[in-house]
Structures are given as structure tokens and as C-alpha cells.
Amino acid sequence: MSEVNTPGRGRPRAALTFDDGHVGNAALLPVFIKHGIRPTIYICSSIVTHQRTHWWLTPGAQRAGVRRLIKLPNAERLEELASYGFHQHERSIDTPISGLSREHIEAMLPHVDFQSHTRFHPTLTRLARDECTEELACSKQEVEEITGAACEHFAYPYGRYAARDVEILKATGYKTARTTLVGWNDEKSDPYRLRAFDIEDNSSVQWFAAQMTGVPLAWRILPLGAIKAAFIRTLGLTGIRKTRTNAGNESAT
């Protein structure tokens, strides 16, 4: 993320980011090295290196409904997960470890930028102010302890945040925060509300390139007339207008 903030000599740039710090990210290291890519991985700092499981991957969360749990006040969510035997501060015993190990991160450090995604991946808007401050401040400190480098960038869990959370991020020393809103960023973008494109695991290079143009996004969210108008503007066909002949038929000139 820091490299993207530097001048690009007029060329557009893309930052490749991953969320959560899943153990499977370690298998991508040879790909990063081969293509000279330095991605940013936003890690849950109290899950990675601790032999723990991301809470939504546990059997209890799956049974209770992850989407519903995300919307609960944090204390209620943790209480319900505890009823299924999950305690976020404890080491995973009955479920596979889902976070990167310290050995993984040490091997990846020369080629990967690790930044913050909170400690345990709560919904920020469902936290009390003191809880939110603790998550953001402690995660920043933990990431710096793990990597030995400054932690200045953040990604909102589930893309959910409020003005209060932005204030806390600024006060805690973060310089940017990435949302899940779709779109591009430029020099006018709010650094604490950065947009992104969600790329699925099975996306081809061609589909990735297509998404970067914004055409698939426009096709999904814009009315057909707006898409047509955009293409006309792109092609420079601004001189097209409709006139009516004597016979009452329309023709383009």
C-alpha cells in the first residue's frame, strides 16, 4: 500500500490485497516471487501465529449462521459462540488452524506487506468505543511486533465502518483504510475510504483485466440507457442526433 501511494509517472497502479491472513496464503509465495508482486495481506493479528481459527469457520458459527452473527452486538456474538464451545482467546483444538503461522510470515516478509485487519475480526460498528479503540490500537502494535515494521494500513472487517471508526483509526496512527466498496482510487480519494475490486479465487487473468476496466461493474449497476450513453461518449459519437423526415420516420444524422 505504501508503494502505491508514491508517484506512478502517470501510469495507473493496482494494489493486490488479501484479507484475514489465512494459512492458504502461504502457498501463494512462489507466485508472488515469480511475478515480482508484493501484495498486502491484512491479518487478524491475534489469530495468526497463535494456532487459532477465524471464528466464522468454526462449526458453531456455521450452525448459528455467520451472516446473522455478524450483525449482533459483539458481546452477544461472543456469548453465542461460547455456547458452541468457541472462545476467541483460546487455541484451536477441535477445528483446523486457519491463520498463518509465525514461520509462514517470516518466510513471506521479504515479499509481502502485512498490515492490520483487527485482532479477532469483529464488526467495528457493533463494538463499544473502548472496544473498537482496543481492537485497532492493539492490532497495530501486534502487527508491528510480528513483522518488525510499521503498521499504517487497515482493512475494515466485512467492509463495515462508521465515522467514529475513522476517527479512531486516525488517532491511532493509521494512514489508510480499505473498504469493500467497488471502484477506483485517485488523488482525490479519501485515504480512509479506499475502494477495491473483489476478485474471486477462480478468476482468470482475462476476467481480472476486464474487471479493472469497470465494464462488468457498469453492466451490473447501471441502467441500459446509461451504459449505452457511456459507450457513445467513449467512442466520441457525440454528433449523433435524431431528426424527423417528412414521412414521419426517424433517421440518425
Predicted feature locations:
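C-terminal active-site subregion of NodB/CE4 polysaccharide deacetylases
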Residues: 1-17, 22-25, 34, 39, ...
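Metal-dependent polysaccharide deacetylase catalytic core of the NodB/CE4 family, i.e.
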Residues: 11-14, 33-162, 193-194
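Short amphipathic alpha-helical segments and helix-helix/interface helices
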Residues: 28-30, 102-106, 166-170
